[in-house]
Amino acid sequence: MTKQHPTDDIKIREVKELLPPIAHLYELPISDEAAGLVHRTRHEIADLVHGKDNRLLVIIGPCSIHDTKAALEYAERLLVLRKKYEKELLIVMRVYFEKPRTTVGWKGLINDPHLDGTFDINYGLRQARSLLLTLNNMGMPASTEFLDMITPQYYADLISWGAIGARTTESQVHRELASGLSCPVGFKNGTDGNLKIAIDAIGAASHPHHFLSVTKAGHSAIVHTGGNPDCHVILRGGKEPNYSTEHVKSAAEQLIKAGLSPKLMVDCSHANSRKDYRRQMEVAQDVAAQLENGEDNIMGVMVESHLVEGRQDKPEVYGQSITDACIGWDTTEEMLALLAAANRKRVAP
């Protein structure tokens, strides 16, 4: 680069050093209890994906985490229900730290943990790992969405199930990432409802890949993966909802035609709820009816839930989402009871 004709970093205002993953892993090492829970839960979810377990996987929790205190209170309440319905449901808490934005907005606890535009990402990564460690130590397995190739090195060892979102399912690097993740992964259909891109993603992620990332020491590296056989589709709706009996049957047929497991998950939120959080219960009721009628290709559901229903722009109400609106705790209890009863009937001899 010359002073007369600069060509590099022209639009970059600042570059800050990021602490390497090993710094956080050293200060917040995974415990034997947490490792055992993650190991067991991953295997249980894999069994669900491959039809070896007849429980229903329930990924449930806040749209995003912005207050770790509220997240822990939510987890304590959810843990009671996890134990209560352990024969019918495999409950895993939704713990999302990064939010893909359609345009702009708060991008999550990791990106801006103080909610003030300071973008203290080093602190955000530490907060994320600390929360995940606490959750696993208390017996609550965690799930999250993976958005890039670097942050998984900071906390993926504490994740039991991962999601690739509707905006990134078609992305080559996210398919490559999924091929190397140690946990089962769900791929959402596209925002327009396109299911083929999710089916293609599962096929791609099941194969080995080479991609660029970083080591635990923070050095640039070429990662060679072995492929992930434990991936599945998430029906999240598109231009219209896609959770009905007909949609589930069609999706299962397409998966079988592609040589994949027909087991799939239904997202009760997003386009399936027509972006109205109250309609998540309607979706759950429809899924419950399908389960009672013997539908065995639905292996899981995803629900956006918090202590207080609705949403807010600023964190003024404790336990309420600042991103997508969520159902409240009372509705959460009703929904889990409904799903547990339905699955109990599905597997009854």
Residue ranges and their predicted role:
Residues G61, V266, G328:
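Conserved, mostly hydrophobic/aromatic
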Residues E304-K345:
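Internal helix-turn-beta structural module
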Residues T2-T7, E88-Y243, H247-V248, H270-A271, ...:
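Active-site-facing alpha/beta catalytic cores
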Residues D9-V49:
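N- or domain-start disorder-to-order transition segments that initiate the globular core
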Residues K83-K87, K257-G259, N293-D296:
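Short helix-capping segments at alpha-helix termini
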Residues L57-A70, D324:
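Conserved phosphate/anionic-ligand binding catalytic regions in large, soluble enzymes, centered on
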